[in-house]
Curated annotation (Swiss-Prot):
Protein name: Chaperone protein DnaJ
Gene that specifies this protein: dnaJ
CXXCXGXG motif repeats: 145-152, 162-169, 184-191, 198-205
Major localization class: cytoplasm
Xref: Pfam families: DnaJ (PF00226), DnaJ_C (PF01556), DnaJ_CXXCXGXG (PF00684)
């Protein structure tokens, strides 16, 4: 089967300049690249054909031979190169331009590797969460070596660009029509060759260290909130900037209050006599004790809302919501029991004086009436 004309394959005129040829190749390679066509055999063959045409037409000497002799110029062992290397055509540059998100950008260059971010979990009390406080913490991290100041080299030692990756820290390889990029195996991504590594960090430029920090906890924080301490993470490689430290807040469970956002909830026990007659009770708040009036005929479960007595966060103050719990007296003596019996007798049949009982009895009557229908 006769080979197609290389200019025809790329869709350009014979007099096309280098820019037109490169532009045409990029457009077609993008269209038929195996990563996009996913196993389409016909597209793979077209991709090979496009590569072969471009390798010849992008090389001035090969193009001149092709223009004069056609495909015969590369027969009998004088082929276009079999795509084993980049040859005269800069495939690496083109694939880097087209698939930068896959291969990490265009032409390789030494990368500044920022330090790792660190996490520290801290537990605080509700009282500490409500008001701003300071906490001392210890973290194990990586810092720039004090001996070599992060260079990884002994004083006076030569630092040269890695001869393999030329300082990029990464190398590209072409296999068939695939271009891959990986960490340089000789410099391990540093992009440099050190004549005499630092005796303290052994050429790493970083050492492990325990650091003491003081963290300011802002008022109103809650469990799950994170505080970001910029530049307090691990030191970067090759003198690069440090990462950040994230302090994650955990607020301990409180023995009185439960929290929901900026609101606080608590139960307030009162006697059944106070519930019936009314009175005054002391309620705990974050600012101390507060006397609150209990209205007469208060039922269990009633909520008292104390506005602005909750948690203040970002300028907004929540409420303290108190649920009334009526306590039943225990260990009564005979005199007390007799008084309660007399009270019960005095209320017999007077359901209006027992609203819960009235509602319950009405509901029971309706239930049985419906069953009998």
């Amino acid at each position: 089967m006769a080979k197609r004309d290389y200019y025809e394959i790329l869709g350009v005129q014979k007099g096309a300049d280098d820019k037109e040829i490169k532009r045409a190749y990029k457009r077609l390679a993008m269209k038929y690249h195996p990563d996009r066509t996913k196993g389409d055999k016909e597209s793979e063959e077209k991709f090979k054909e496009i590569n072969e045409a471009y390798e010849v037409l992008a090389d001035k000497e090969k193009r001149a031979m092709y223009d004069q002799y056609g495909h015969a110029a590369f027969e009998q062992g004088g082929g276009a190169g079999g795509f084993g290397g980049f040859s005269g055509a800069d495939f690496g540059d083109i694939f880097g331009d087209m698939f930068g998100d896959i291969f990490g950008g265009g032409r390789s260059r030494q990368r500044v590797v920022r330090g790792e971010d660190l996490r520290y979990d801290i537990e605080i009390s509700l009282e500490e969460a409500v008001k701003s406080c300071k906490k001392d913490i210890q973290i194990n991290t990586l810092v720039h070596c004090g001996t070599c100041h992060g260079s990884g080299a002994e004083a006076g030692s030569k630092i040269e660009s890695c001869p393999t990756c030329h300082g990029a820290g990464r190398v590209r390889r072409q296999q068939s029509f695939f271009v891959t990029e990986q960490t340089c195996p000789h410099c391990h991504g540093t992009g440099k060759k050190i004549e005499k590594p630092c005796h303290t960090c052994h050429g790493e430029g970083r050492v492990h260290k325990t650091q003491n920090l003081t963290v300011t906890i802002p008022m109103g924080v809650d469990t799950g909130n994170q505080l970001r301490l910029a530049g307090k993470g691990a030191a970067g490689e090759n003198g690069a900037p440090a990462g950040d430290l994230y302090v994650v807040i955990h607020v301990k469970k409180h023995h009185i209050f439960e929290r929901d956002g900026n609101n606080l909830y608590c139960e307030v026990p009162i006697s059944f006599t106070m519930a019936a007659l009314g009175g005054e009770v002391e309620i705990p708040t974050l600012d101390g004790r507060l006397k609150v009036k209990i209205p007469a005929e208060t039922q269990t479960g009633k909520l008292l809302r104390l506005r602005g007595k909750g948690i203040t966060s970002r300028g907004y103050a929540g409420d303290l919501i108190c649920e009334i719990v009526i306590e039943t007296p225990i260990k009564l003596n005979e005199e007390q029991k007799e008084l309660l019996r007399k009270l019960e007798e005095s209320l017999e049949g007077k359901t209006l004086q027992r609203p819960k009982s009235s509602g319950f009895l009405d509901g029971v009557k309706k239930f049985f009436d419906n069953l009998g229908k």
